[in-house]
């Protein structure tokens, strides 16, 4: 058991100012929106001030080819914010041989993200295909270096991350629409290019479900295949095990009873984390009991209230009311 202390005082304040101009329009078959402007982050760390002025943009649109097929595109260009845990000027020991070292020169991470998707219906089959592309400029990673007795962990801006994900989902109805079978195939290719890391990973996983309706009963089976993903936060590789679920629900008037069995073949959800950082090699097993074998039972009674009225046609919200930047 490690017991230690660090003495120091850090003062960090961040003021964000952003101005946006928006343009939107719509016709019978399409709508679009574009919101662009500038964001300035005024950061004061221990009496030293930095200004980070970054352009921001949010845009998108949808086109209805006909009543059964549509295309949509949504994108953004924005940046992260800071908190005292990643922008400071301190070194804190976390164990007898490990220490977290702050980086006062840490700069914002810029994100360019685009999602292109298609939704359609072919007879009793419903098809959805989407492509997600994300680029992280000035990507923030963990740099590890060591002296004779300590391994130091420092967050730093290094290189660019390229994330690509192609997913396709097909749902089909059988037995007079009482049985629905759905399958989703996901293919990812992620790259991390920089001075500290030069990594790439091809990832494929499959999700499938079968839902059967009989009277007031619903029974559903879910499955997700095992896969290995590249987590860019340090970075590291995470090896995930398959996931199995069985759900049954009963609905009668205002009563609903749901029972679910999650991962019945193992008490724990096991995740294997590996990575070679040069000065040390990470190889750990994480066991999560809440995501392992468990049984959930839920009982719901719905109380009707308010005045009933016929619902009209719903209109797609074509306006961008707000934009939320993320903490890294």
What are these model-derived regions, one by one?
Residues 1-328:
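Exposed, low-structure sequence patches enriched in small/polar residues
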